[in-house]
Design a protein with these regions (language model features):
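Membrane-embedded beta-strand positions in outer-membrane beta-barrel channels/transporters
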Residues: 78-80, 157-159, 227-229, 263-267, ...
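Extracytoplasmic beta-strand/coil segments of soluble accessory domains associated
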Residues: 55-109, 136, 146-163
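Outer-membrane beta-barrel transmembrane strands
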Residues: 221-240, 245-248, 262, 346-386
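Short, polar/charged loop or turn motifs at beta-strand boundaries
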Residues: 36-59, 65-71, 79-86, 98, ...
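Short, acidic, small-residue-rich periplasmic hinge/interaction motif at the N-terminus
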Residues: 2-46, 54
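Short acidic/polar hinge/loop motifs at secondary-structure boundaries
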Residues: 100-141
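N-terminal periplasmic accessory domains that precede
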Residues: 3-8, 18, 53-55, 79-82, ...
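Surface-exposed loop/interface segments of Gram-negative outer-membrane beta-barrel transport/assembly proteins
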Residues: 15, 31, 91-92, 97, ...
Length: 386
């Protein structure tokens, strides 16, 4: 009494015929390439908003490590493929936007040489892009994939393909993404023994009658990141237009660590001369304001005095971080501890040493492709980036 069941599985053509963007900016099936290309879609990039969208690649690409800086919200990130290749040089991958390498105008990150050096690391240039404008990201690793860009691509290539107008339809998209952040893991501190002497940072003194209630976690706040985006896409078989606006307003977990980004993007693609000539023009504006990026070193870093605050002492008294000096007729910092470690009141740092930074970036690109035949074409690209 056996019964035969015929089961037919539907092909998942999206997986079987996966299309990726190659080093030349040409779309090909992944299985036809002789080198490794991994692609990340826009949905994966924007699912959880980050002030720097590069951080959203973490865990999505095999063999790639995303090193986020500790500067705070909006800080720069490095994309390291298949391990560190240089101890002192730049291990970051090359970014290519719509077939054109992106110049890196960020300052090099170096370790401070003494206690009084150090500054918060600003966001890298790629972080100024609006993630909602990205169609997909292809990660190219290995010498074959990056050969087109020479030695600049020795550490790999991150190919970014931006959106353009859709043929035959008009669509409007509006989105909002709000995320919250808080410290996940903090160092553990003893609260049994007090200061060795008055004004000292060392907590190797006598046993406290009442365990210290000091908790560095009270210094931090809940971070908020609000991202808004609106876009318009329209087009015909001869002309496609894309327009987008984006805003990112974020507050870090340290007071006054603020980040604001405003983006405007316009792109137009047109076909001429019996569809043999394709012109692609785009303009991107990114305006970024940031402040109070956590510094390296000691003197400008609020975390070091926070963690070295002596157990058993009253932390609330340093929250009133300034006192009036009648002799100098001005407000001065209140920090009743030794200056041997070049530390300052953490509240004084966050309130008075904000180090604001304002960056405007303009990127205009133009490309022209002429098809001589079905099997041969010539493409020219130009870019202004300032």
């Amino acid at each position: 009494n056996a019964q035969v069941l015929n089961i037919v599985l539907t092909e998942d053509t999206e997986v079987l015929n996966e299309v990726v963007v190659t080093a030349l900016g040409i779309k090909k099936e992944a299985k036809s390439l002789s080198y490794n290309v991994q692609q990340v879609s826009n949905d994966e990039i924007t699912r959880i908003a980050d002030a720097n969208f590069v951080n959203n690649l973490n865990g999505k690409v095999a063999g790639v490590t995303i090193n986020s800086s500790s500067a705070g919200v909006g800080g720069s990130s490095r994309v390291v493929m298949r391990g560190t290749k240089s101890l002192n040089g730049n291990n970051n991958a090359l970014y290519v936007v719509d077939g054109i390498p992106m110049s890196d105008m960020s300052a090099a990150s170096t370790q401070p040489t003494d206690s009084y050096e150090g500054a918060g690391q600003s966001g890298d240039p790629i972080s100024g892009l609006n993630p909602e404008d990205i169609e997909s990201i292809s990660v190219l690793s290995g010498p074959s994939a990056a050969a087109l860009y020479g030695s600049a691509a020795a550490n790999g290539v991150v190919m970014i393909t931006t959106k353009k107008g859709r043929e035959g339809r008009t669509s409007v998209s509006i989105s909002n993404n709000t995320t919250f952040s808080a410290p996940l893991v903090l160092p553990e501190f003893q609260n049994t023994y007090g200061q060795t002497e008055v004004g000292s940072y060392y907590s190797w003194g006598s046993k406290l009658n009442t365990p210290s209630s000091y908790d560095p976690k009270d210094f931090f706040q809940t971070g908020v990141n609000v991202t808004n985006a609106a876009s318009l896409s329209t087009g015909t078989d001869k002309n496609q237009t894309y327009l987008s606006l984006g805003t990112t307003n974020a507050n870090g977990i340290i007071h006054n660590n603020d980040y604001e980004r405003y983006n405007v993007t316009v792109r137009n693609v047109a076909k001429m001369l019996k569809d043999k000539l394709t012109l692609d023009l785009s303009f991107m504006l990114s305006s970024v304001k940031e402040q109070n990026m956590t510094s390296q070193g000691l003197y400008y870093n609020p975390l070091v005095p926070l963690y070295l605050f002596p157990a058993g002492d009253d932390f609330s008294k340093v929250q009133a971080y300034q006192r009036y000096d009648s002799e100098r007729n001005l407000l001065t910092q209140y920090w009743p501890y030794s200056t041997s470690l070049a530390l300052q009141n953490p509240y004084w740092i966050t309130e008075h040493i904000k180090i604001p930074n304002h960056k405007n970036r303009y990127m205009a690109t133009a490309s022209a492709k002429y098809d001589f035949a079905d099997w041969i074409n010539v493409t020219a690209r130009a870019k202004m980036d300032r």
